[in-house]
């Protein structure tokens, strides 16, 4: 049995009615473009992505968040098997991902105001 997350379960109604779930701002690229970017260059190093876009800060944070979520997925199975180190990496990754989500939300709010 595989786990399939319900992406709309924890989202506010306003976000669901907004249309696009993956792109909180019109200046940000789609998730398929980020998947292509990550598959071409690997996860971003120190939060910097390779590209020619003008708004590198929100893109790099979003790409970094996607990379962290990808890494978190790799830690789940060893955690279930009882690996203490995988459990600690999972905890640190969740904390880091939560802070990046806050930063991405703040960035999109700033972009929406301007």
UniProtKB/Swiss-Prot annotation:
Bias kind Polar residues: ranges: 20-36, 47-57
Transport is among the record's keywords: no
Which stretches does the entry tag as region Interaction with CDK2AP2?
Answer: 19-24
PTM info:
Phosphorylated in vitro by IKBKE at Ser-45.
| List of residues that carry Phosphoserine | 45
- The UniProt entry lists the main location of this chain as nucleus
Localization per record: Nucleus; Chromosome
The tissues where this chain's protein is expressed are given as:
Oral keratinocytes.
> In the UniProt record, does the keyword Metal-binding occur?
no
Keywords, in A-Z order: Cell cycle, Chromosome, Disulfide bond, Nucleus, Phosphoprotein, Transcription, Transcription regulation, Tumor suppressor
Gene Ontology terms: cellular component: chromosome; cytoplasm; nucleus
Record region (Disordered): 18-57
InterPro entries from the xrefs? DOC_1/2
Quaternary structure note: Homodimer. Component of the nucleosome remodeling and deacetylase (NuRD) repressor complex, composed of core proteins MTA1, MTA2, MTA3, RBBP4, RBBP7, HDAC1, HDAC2, MBD2, MBD3, and peripherally associated proteins CDK2AP1, CDK2AP2, GATAD2A, GATAD2B, CHD3, CHD4 and CHD5. The exact stoichiometry of the NuRD complex is unknown, and some subunits such as MBD2 and MBD3, GATAD2A and GATAD2B, and CHD3, CHD4 and CHD5 define mutually exclusive NuRD complexes. Interacts with monomeric unphosphorylated CDK2. Interacts with CDK2AP2. Interacts with GATAD2A. Interacts with HDAC1. Interacts with HDAC2.
| Function in brief | Inhibitor of cyclin-dependent kinase CDK2. Also acts as a component of the histone deacetylase NuRD complex which participates in the remodeling of chromatin.
Q: Which PANTHER family match?
A: CYCLIN-DEPENDENT KINASE 2-ASSOCIATED PROTEIN 1, DELETED IN ORAL CANCER 1/CDK2-ASSOCIATED PROTEIN 1
Family per UniProt? Belongs to the CDK2AP family.
Protein name, per record: Cyclin-dependent kinase 2-associated protein 1
């Amino acid at each position: 049995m595989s786990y399939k997350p319900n992406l709309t379960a924890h989202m506010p109604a306003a976000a669901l009615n907004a249309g696009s779930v993956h792109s909180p701002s019109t200046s940000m690229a789609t998730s398929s473009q980020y998947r292509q970017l990550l598959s071409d260059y690997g996860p971003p190093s120190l939060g910097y992505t390779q590209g020619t876009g003008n708004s590198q800060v929100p893109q790099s944070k979003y790409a970094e968040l996607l990379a962290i979520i990808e890494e978190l997925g790799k830690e789940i199975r060893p955690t279930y098997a009882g690996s203490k180190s995988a459990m600690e990496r999972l905890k640190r990754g969740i904390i880091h991902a939560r802070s990046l989500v806050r930063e991405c939300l703040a960035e999109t709010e700033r972009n929406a105001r301007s």
